[in-house]
Amino acid sequence: MIYNESTSALETKREEACPTRSPQKSTVAPSANGSGRIRTRPFIFDKMQDFTTANQLRGLGVYPYFRVITSAQDTEVMIDGKPVLMLGSNSYLGLTNHPKIKEAAKAAVDKYGTGCAGSRFLNGTLDIHIELEQALARLVKKEAVLLYSTGFQVNLGVISALAGRGDFILGDKSNHASIVEGCQASPARFHRFSHKDMGALEDRLRQIRPDAGKLIVVDGVFSMEGDIIQLPELCAIAKKHGAAVMVDDAHSIGVLGRNGAGTASHFGLDDEVHLIMGTFSKSLASLGGFIASDAETIDYLKHHSRSLIFSASMSPSNAAAVLAAIEIMVDQPERIARLWANTERMKQGLLSLGFDLGHSETPILPLFCRDVMKAFNYCKRLQEEGVFVNPVVSPGVLPGEELIRISLMATHTDKQIDFALEKLGAVGKELGLI
């Protein structure tokens, strides 16, 4: 599942820390002389015993997390020695097993070794990092780009560095957990507005003094329900109130816009979005992330973003893989066209079966179950039928909005999609979802 908050999906809410604690669990044991009882573990580990939900799900045979795949991430994967159709991958362009990308990664290992042994700030900047930053800047039409080791670190490090004391951050309530973490790590005031509610956003902006620093942060494509932020309206509101706009394009790069350049490109608003964030673990078949902006902002982040300065730099093989993936994405626009054709085929098939897909506008298709155990059972039964999907429960979505998240790839065949529709429909009827 994907997290929207910093708490575990399977944890029940705990009370705030109490002034006293009673050491009367199995964390205590008789003393050697029998005169009393001593704890064998510190209090902080008590929560591990309180956390029982995962084992309960395992006992019911429906635990859906950490499934082990023994093959490449492709349209079909191997689990427990059996082939399973993959409908849960973020590899939108189907590039994770592309021979050209694998060769580029291997060549980078031969030239640079397996790692950089330091941060970008010190000894960890390679010429291939600079080459990739320049390629990304051209793609998203920004002056400069800065690479990070993961996408999560981008949001954590950029937001906390840019928004300081006395500033204000405004974010959509459905934003990814990494955005939330970045906002909470900043000393700025953090406000969340209801999902895609532009009226609520503007109401909040009106309450902030005009000369205060203001940053609006949103997902371009929301990762659970597949809808797109209404960027033209948001940018107009931001401009009116003197706010900067940052868009997380983790699920937009390779999906939306000119050559897969993302949400701003999709709407023709390249100059209205001040910061574009992206990841490499989805369409670009690798690992890492980036922030794109004007050169002055990027230079500031180089010297103030702690998740950049205090992390080892992106491995050379990862960087080489992204460069090769960008080249393929730009040179083969038919991949994005095929992704959208596959999305339409699956979407129309699901709608004809009677599934509720919410407001999805992208290759992310949510099948609403609106029940935790139905979502887990649906996932289990589908895998038994040879289809891999992801269940999403609270806090990934609000309670009562539980869903199965399907994501399409450009490399899915019509035959695979039709097979999936057959199984999704049959199991959906079996469980009373349609």
Protein language model features and the residues they cover:
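Active-site C-terminal subdomain of aminotransferase-like
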Residues: H241-A244, H251, L256-E361, K374
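N-terminal "arm"/small-domain region of PLP-dependent enzymes with the aminotransferase-like
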Residues: I2-K13, C18-P30, G34-S35, F45-T114, ...
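Conserved PLP-anchoring active-site segment centered on the Schiff-base-forming lysine
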Residues: V158-A177
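PLP-dependent enzyme catalytic core of the Aspartate aminotransferase-like
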Residues: M1-N33, P99, E103-A107, K111, ...
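Conserved PLP-binding catalytic core of the aspartate aminotransferase-like
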Residues: A337-M346, L351-G386, G396, G400-E401, ...
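Active-site phosphate-binding strand-loop segment of PLP-dependent enzymes
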Residues: H191, H195-V247
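Conserved N-terminal alpha-helix of the aminotransferase class I/II PLP-enzyme fold
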Residues: E103, A107-G151
